Amino acid sequence: MKRIVVDIETTLGHKTIWLCCTKDIDTGEKHTWYQAKAFQEYIADATLLIGHNLISFDAYHLNSLWKTKIVLNKCYDTLLVSRLLSPSLEGGHSLAAWGNTLHTQKIDYKATWQWLVGRREDYKGECYDKPHMGLLAVYCERDIDVTALLYHHLVAETEAQKFSQESVELEHTVAAIMSKQERNGFKLDIPYATVLLTTVKGRLDSIYESMQERWPPYTVERVSEKTGKPLK
């Protein structure tokens, strides 16, 4: 068994992967990868890849930019499972929120970058387009530490709350479909949709008229207590 926590750091527009950090949750072994080939070889025999927002972000961009072949049935997305277990979790489901809960806080990368370079960003996200690579690696490594802790917590909670493996898998399947729709959109039969809209509006008008006939509107006359005259 080889279960690996994965986290990537990219440019603001996600066109380039700067680095990828991994952690074997069974051995504790960590790596920071800067090249696709070595990373591809490392995860080739992984039985499980774990990440926070793994399906919509990390796995998608790794497959697109580093040409990995990450498949859905080998993914465990801690963000999805967190939402499954507690949809209205106080504080939210972000890795930063979980870091506070698990007493292993995320690093404030932006603030630290600004301190290191001695200025504020010229535009939002500049710290990712022009990263301090040493800081970025440390930041990413902390993220995989938090994600590893969160994975163990969620596995225990899933068992304690008696959530089935089927429910977890279904959540991942639906998330993969939704993520694809968000990126590519979806086809819509516009002529049919237009006809359907007209039909529904006609039906609503008919229902409204029937309700007016059954419960006709009436006016309540208000009278002034002082003068006894009708109020306008």
Q: Residues of each region from the PLM?
A:
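Short amphipathic alpha-helix with an adjacent loop that forms part of the alpha/beta core around
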Residues: 37-45
